[in-house]
A protein has these predicted regions:
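Catalytic glycan-binding domains that act on GlcNAc-containing polysaccharides
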Residues: 32-192
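N-terminal secretory targeting signals
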Residues: 1-53, 180, 184-229
Length: 229
């Protein structure tokens, strides 16, 4: 993980959480449901509508890949890398990008997964125009949805099965273990609450423009201002 104290991490993360949109949602207790169920954030519904992959499948996979305990519960964290089987989480996209460049000098791309859905750069990096873009949450999620849909189309009938293929196309124990994790994540979701039209419209706002919106919007996602190509 990014090297910093717990106090420093909290101070850096909390301002970001106040500006979330689309990809990190809230915890709710739905009528007739158990306590603490998560609603699926609108960004996942948006990508689902574009790709034909169920929003709950995308969100469960993202939770399985990059969960981080935040003040509003366990959520996927976009500034995540996995290198040679070890996970690293950073407080900003820039920190993750700088670390990625360093890792790329020491490891082959097939040992590096990036972003909110942990897309492997060696096998699927061709879907990104740059390594910086690979860390953009919506772009990363759309690529993940494309891979997940391909897995489903090759063996239709079960999105859980497709998730196992997403993680380990060769199948076997790694795929079975991963499917069990995705099932557990799926069980934490509130599938009865529909996403509103306003939330979908907010999710459609391009990332560079989201910092212009009121900062008290709970579902607002903001990208770091700086970029490095």
């Amino acid at each position: 993980m990014a090297n910093s104290s717990v106090l420093n991490r909290s101070r850096q993360i909390l301002p970001v959480l106040s500006l979330l949109a689309g990809l990190i949602g809230s915890t709710v207790t739905a009528a007739g449901e158990g306590p603490g169920l998560q609603t699926i954030p609108p960004g996942y519904h948006l990508v689902a509508s574009e790709t034909g992959v169920p929003a709950e499948a995308l969100y469960s996979v993202s939770l399985a890949e990059t969960s981080r305990k935040l003040p509003n519960g366990e959520r996927p964290w976009p500034w995540t890398l996995n290198v040679a089987g070890k996970g690293y989480r950073y407080n900003t996209r820039q920190e993750a990008y700088d670390a990625l460049l360093s890792f790329m000098r020491r490891y082959p791309l097939k040992r590096i997964d990036v972003g909110i859905a942990q897309v492997n750069l060696g096998w699927n990096g061709r879907y990104f125009s740059s390594y910086w873009e690979a860390l953009e949450p919506y772009t990363n999620l759309r690529v993940a949805a494309r891979i997940l849909k391909s897995c489903y189309d090759s063996n239709p009938g079960s999105w859980i099965q497709a998730a196992g293929c997403y993680h380990h196309p060769a199948g076997g124990k790694p795929a079975r273990t991963y499917k069990a994790i995705v099932k557990r994540k799926l069980a934490t979701l509130d599938l009865s609450t529909p996403v509103s039209y306003a939330e979908l419209q907010l999710a459609r706002i391009p990332s560079p423009q989201r910092h212009l919106l009121p900062q008290n919007r709970e579902l607002q996602w903001v990208e770091p201002r700086e970029s490095r190509q």
